[in-house]
Amino acid sequence: MSKTHLTEQKFSDFALHPAVIEALEKKGFHNCTPIQALALPLTLEGRDVAGQAQTGTGKTMAFLTSTFHYLLSHPAIADRQVNQPRALIMAPTRELAVQIHADAEPLAQATGLKLGLAYGGDGYDKQLKVLESGVDILIGTTGRLIDYAKQNHINLGAIQVVVLDEADRMYDLGFIKDIRWLFRRMPPATQRLNMLFSATLSYRVRELAFEQMNNAEYVEVEPEQKTGHRIKEELFYPSNEEKMRLLQTLLEEEWPDRAIVFANTKHRCEDIWGHLAADGHRVGLLTGDVAQKKRLRILEEFTRGDLDILVATDVAARGLHIPAVTHVFNYDLPDDCEDYVHRIGRTGRAGASGHSISLACEEYALNLPAIETYIGHSIPVSKYNPDALMTDLPKPLRLTRARPGNGPRRNGPPRNRRRSG
């Protein structure tokens, strides 16, 4: 893999449909990332692809470009009905489905192909109204897709392109039976273009590719190191009593443009949110207990820059592409080594640099040896002066008194406490 994020390969070098090239160039996409440069020559020949790549390497645009080109270059199945989409893109989470849909919209506007979105939690009738008007490309989560299929709101008999994104995550979340249910209602694999992407091409993912794809070509983009060479990693050893004050002091010193703070439990996340919101930070909370509409709103606010900090459990650690995240704080070291990689992979994306700061407290420091073995290197340790930690901190807010994402807006350093570093 090249040390630069982009390759010398240009999208315009491929025999892509002119409308697709126009849409890509309008969005500023000229050169391919490594996964795009490997996958597109195969998909443009109509060959199935199973791809392994880190998140943030451009795999979404790889399968969207392939999907739009294929549909524009091949006629729809004869006698296709209005409830029959031509392409199906399956994602493990609602947030990822929404994100893929947003990434696809510029291509849809340029090509005239219609998009549909289907995910659980809310919006059943709103989503259905779009489907009833007919869509070419349907993006969704498996549960809602099956619901619509059982009600005959959609029929998969005219599918020409299938994409399975975050396949390993599908297994982790127990969706594999749903995936197979949907595949059984499509035309045979030999009559479709099939694409699968995954952070890892494990045995079970390869088994799925063998089962549901047509002699898939495997393409892999291995990072130079699991954590990405553009991410500065840093580790502190705080006591449990000093942990929160250290986090707040680091936030004052670093003053990140956009940061995600990860913790291992929803209760810990709620506690962190309460401390940061009370201290005047523009902070949002993202856990499994947050209602779907609110989760999407918080993600939109964070992406727009209306929120500076997102406190999250690992529900947000995979699949979400939030641009320009400058810092990731591991308030708790994760129990799963892979979660460490996925967490800090929120920063340092698409060629940008990033900063990851981890707190190895008394409770979770035991997780560190396994993490360092997994990533293949020791995380550099930094020391702090306990006497220099912030002390004039307000009482934390409680969720019953304030809603996540609605903390006081931060127009400058709270009470002029910005540190010189």
Curated annotation (Swiss-Prot):
It is an enzyme of class 3 (hydrolase). Pfam families: DEAD, Helicase_C. ATP binds at residues 53-60. Its EC number is 3.6.4.13. Keywords: ATP-binding, Cytoplasm, Helicase, Hydrolase, Nucleotide-binding, RNA-binding. It catalyses: ATP + H2O = ADP + phosphate + H(+). Belongs to the DEAD box helicase family. RhlB subfamily. Component of the RNA degradosome, which is a multiprotein complex involved in RNA processing and mRNA degradation. This is ATP-dependent RNA helicase RhlB.
